[in-house]
Amino acid sequence: MAAYAAGKAGLIGLVQVLAAEIGAQKIRVNALLPGGTDTPSSVTNAPGATKELLAFVEGLHALKRMAQPEEIANAALFLASDLSSFVTGTAMLADGGVSISRT
């Protein structure tokens, strides 16, 4: 867990520094931090995964469910679009409330 947390913190720091360094060139830099996403490779879809495991993972999210891949894609599309033309140097959470559940 320490390596994961350090990697995530490093990514956020890199985004902020790059945004400051190249913002004058009209280049935006952001990160998308997704929560648990219901994909074929998700732990909840692994062979032998139980309903209890799914309930546990969903329970970590304030919305009490995992994201659908399209929901994460929509967040990425927003960051890549002109709708976010004044957004830079940020780490956008699309985690269904996992980050607030732990505070």
Residue ranges: model-predicted function:
Residues 4, 12:
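Catalytic tyrosine of NAD(P)H-dependent dehydrogenase/reductases that use a Tyr as the general acid/base
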Residues 1-3, 43:
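Conserved catalytic loop/helix region of short-chain dehydrogenase/reductase
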Residues 61-72:
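A conserved structural motif in NAD(P)-dependent oxidoreductases
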Residues 24, 36-60, 101-103:
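A glycine/serine/threonine-rich, flexible loop-to-helix segment
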